[in-house]
Swiss-Prot record:
Its main location: membrane. The gene is lptD. InterPro entries: LipoPS_assembly_LptD, LptD, LptD_2, LptD_C. Residues 1-31 form the signal peptide. Keywords: Cell outer membrane, Membrane, Signal. GO terms for biological process: Gram-negative-bacterium-type cell outer membrane assembly; lipopolysaccharide transport. Belongs to the LptD family. This is LPS-assembly protein LptD.
Length: 794
């Protein structure tokens, strides 16, 4: 028998496959849909001024507003998504209702439906109890966990949870992806199928860019979308067409084309266009194939493969061009085939054990400057190949590795090429015995180089064993420390092709060191900020009785350390193991720190020190490294952090004999709290190397949306610019654009140029390579990029 309710009371129903329960309750909720219907995005969009302060504070300044998801439950609480929708009862309410037993329920006026995490509102609804199908007339609004849908009418299955909407709009809150469609099917909680649809991450009414397609499927569970017959539109004008694409809607990986990369470089003879294709082969390995056309050179391909295991990650990168026409023209006799390979691996085995490997090889010395765009190979004269394992424990460490090089420029003489270590084994350990501390540092190396065309010491290869046992008496207190120690620096050689005597010989150097420091502090204040000021004097004495003439020993891996403040507390002025410096010297140094007692931050540190030599240093490395000075240059360091966003670092070597600065390095770094403003000012000076350069870099917002980017490097000795970078960046809340012009110095001391672009569509990634070059040039830019886009959340 039909039943109906026509008063202003609300009929509220709880429906299941077994029974229908009807209850009456008062309703004070306004019906949706009067007048023109807002889209899903318009419903949840809030201007910046209407957002909660904590949400607005997370928005970038170039965003005018953001989305605030509404509540799912009618009582203001989000309905938990427990269970399968079809197994949960349907709750319904309306201003009027007519019910036919075991047949149909008709609802009219402010209809509200809820089944588990699914909720919808509309003007009218018909529910067929036999089939479980529900027809809803709009304007309707459907809300669930992380999404909002609107439309003119819909069909909903209470058994499967599928919702089909005509003339629909939608919003995915997590990715801020919105759109519209002639029809939309919510197949499941996480899957949406769209016909004749449009999607974008721009705000409501702002279709700066959009993807328009005949069919679009969004899978939130998998994190990607697929589309057919796709147009990329900019300001409603089509600019690109794909018959089929897949695209990410979150940070997860998905096989498909990435966005094109393009730019211009005089090194590449003009413009280039790249179309990367990403292969998500398995959860633990993937690959990226990047074919690219370079004007003047031809088709060039780069491939990157990544493999992730329970122990670590391995990356293989390849570059190949079959026929580089520009290279062939510049190098008669070459066929134009060029290639490069770079492999890196890192592994952690547990228990303190780890492994690593690096291998790089290129076809010719100009490859890196002409072609390299993505391989992680630095421009260098020698490419290192190294692989080994290491162990770090509480009181000991061990490492063994193989190490070799590819010398890139053919013009480098054989005598200047580095030796390979095949292998090198390092062991060190320490133990405490009462007041004493015993330690050992040891190293075994087999050195090899192709010396067939060399003579004398340069022709030698062979083995070297070095061991330094030490016995120390460390004494520590809150007010200071003292550490006297004695050690023996022992080296044994077994050489091949050695012509100056017995090929097996050793060297023993007795060493005494005594390091002492005191600590004083006092409380003070500056501008009503309490500080703790320290005064830390330090005395370090070193004595090493090394034989003065060690030039009968080949130079396998030895160099002379650059003298800086930290060198004040090293007894040996040589790196490597083929020379042990003689020493009889005393270092006097003083450090003072200013620590903010409110935050614990070190606001200032100043250090100064000098070495007093009691004897001439006679050990040299084939004419370099010996000296008869009685005092070293005065070495100083200054670090200032007056505020969290400003830092000044400066180091200085001043020669009291010549009263001139030997070396100086200074860098001033500033960034605003949100990293929108970046500024660096650097100066480097070296009198021995005849080097003086000034470096200025900045990212400066011209408006909330437009920023200027620049860097300039000037060499005073060459009296010329040696590097520039200038560009503009535009940001709004749905896309950004960068254009950068860069000059850089090549090996032949000529300025090369390149023009780089980058376009990023929020939520879909970017194309172009400008950002990487800016990050390499300007300190803090990586952090700025990380913060550039923000999503409001409650």
């Amino acid at each position: 028998m039909p039943s109906h309710c026509s008063s202003l009371l609300c009929a509220r129903f709880r429906l299941s496959s077994l029974a229908v329960i009807v209850a009456l309750a008062a309703s004070g909720v306004r019906a949706e849909g009067a007048g023109s219907s807002p889209s899903a995005a318009e419903i949840d969009w809030r201007p910046r001024s209407e957002l909660p302060p904590e949400v607005a504070g997370r928005l970038p300044v170039f965003c005018e507003g953001g989305y605030l998801p509404g509540t799912v439950g009618g009582d203001g609480a989000v309905v938990p998504g427990e269970g399968i929708e079809g197994s949960m009862p349907l709750e319904a309410s309306a201003l009027n209702a007519r019910y036919e037993l075991d047949s149909e329920l008709y609802l009219q006026g402010d209809v509200r439906l809820r089944q588990g995490p699914f909720q919808a509102t509309g003007a009218e609804a018909r529910y067929n109890q036999q089939s479980g199908e529900l027809q809803l007339q709009g304007p309707l609004v459907s809300r669930g966990e992380g999404f909002l849908l609107t439309g003119q009418d819909a069909n909903y299955s209470t058994q499967s949870g599928q919702l089909d909407i005509n003339t629909a709009t939608f919003l995915l809150h997590e990715s801020e992806l919105r759109g519209e469609a002639s029809s939309l099917s919510r197949v499941s909680e996480s899957q949406v199928v769209i016909s004749d649809g449009m999607i974008t991450t721009c705000g409501p009414g702002q279709n700066d860019w959009s993807i328009v397609a005949s069919d679009i499927e969004l899978d939130q569970a998998e994190g990607f979308g697929t589309a057919r017959h796709v147009r990329l539109e900019v300001l409603d004008a089509p600019v690109f067409y794909w018959p089929y694409i897949t695209f990410p809607i979150d940070d997860r990986r998905k096989t498909g084309f990435l966005y094109p990369q393009f730019g211009s470089s005089s090194a590449g003879s003009g413009a280039y266009l790249a179309l990367p294709y990403y292969l998500n082969l398995a959860p633990h390995y993937d690959a990226t194939l990047t074919p690219q056309y370079i004007h003047g050179r031809g088709l060039f391909t780069e491939v990157e493969g990544r493999y992730l295991s329970q122990y670590g990650e391995s990356v293989l990168q390849l570059g190949y061009i079959d026929n580089d026409s520009a290279f062939r023209d510049e190098n008669p006799g070459e066929n134009g085939e060029r290639w490069a390979l770079d492999f890196t691996t890192r592994a952690a085995f547990g228990g303190g054990w780890s492994g690593y490997g690096d291998y790089s090889v290129i076809s010719d010395e100009d490859y890196l400057s002409d072609l390299n765009r993505s391989l992680e190979i630095d421009q260098a004269t020698h490419l290192q190949r190294r692989g080994g394992v290491r162990y770090y424990g509480a009181n000991q460490y061990f490492e063994t590795y193989l190490n070799g090089y590819q010398t890139i420029p053919d013009r480098i003489a054989d005598v200047d090429k580095p030796y390979a270590q095949l292998p090198e084994v390092i062991y060190g350990g320490s133990l405490e015995a009462g007041w004493l501390e015993a330690s050992l540092e040891s190293q075994y190396t087999w050195f090899y180089r192709d010396n067939e065309n060399l003579t004398g010491l340069d022709k030698a290869n062979g083995q070297r064993l070095r061991a330094i046992p030490e016995l120390a008496l460390p004494m520590r207190a809150l007010w200071g420390f003292s550490r006297p120690s004695v050690s023996l620096d022992y080296t044994r050689y077994e050489l091949d092709d050695y012509t100056l005597g017995d090929a097996g010989f050793d060297r023993t150097v007795p060493v005494f060191e005594w390091d002492n420091g005191l600590y004083f502090d006092r409380r003070s204040s500056l501008f009503d900020v309490p500080y703790n000021q320290t005064l830390e004097p330090r005395l370090y004495y070193a004595w090493a009785d090394a034989e003065s003439d060690q030039n009968y020993i080949p130079d396998f891996d030895t160099g002379i350390r650059s003298f800086r403040f930290d060198q004040l507390f090293r007894r040996d002025r040589f790196t490597g193991g083929d020379r042990v410096g003689d020493a009889n010297q005393l270092t006097v140094a003083l450090t003072s720190r200013f620590n903010d007692l409110l935050t614990g931050a070190e606001r200032a540190r100043v250090s100064v020190g000098q070495v007093r030599y009691f004897e001439d240093r006679e050990v040299d490395l084939f004419g370099e490294g010996a000296s008869d000075r009685s005092r070293s240059p005065l070495a100083g360091e200054l670090v200032l952090n007056p505020i969290d966003n400003l830092e000044l670092r400066s180091s200085l070597l001043w020669d009291h004999e010549t009263r001139k600065t030997e070396e100086g390095r200074s860098q001033l770094i500033f960034h605003s709290e949100d990293y929108r403003y970046l500024a660096t000012l650097g100066h480097t000076y070296s009198r021995p190397d005849e080097l003086e350069q000034t470096d200025i870099g900045t990212v400066f917002p011209v408006t909330d949306q437009v920023s200027a980017i620049g860097r300039w490097v000037w060499d005073s000795e060459l009296d010329r610019t040696v590097g520039t970078l200038a560009g503009l960046e535009y940001n709004n809340c749905c896309w950004s654009f960068q254009v950068v012009h860069q000059n850089y110095l090549t090996d032949d001391e000529e300025l090369d140029t390149r023009l780089l672009f980058r376009i990023e569509l929020k939520g879909l990634g970017g194309s172009g390579g400008a950002s990487d070059n800016i990050a390499d040039a300007i300190y803090g830019y990586d952090e700025r990029e990380r913060r550039r886009f923000g999503n409001p959340r409650r």
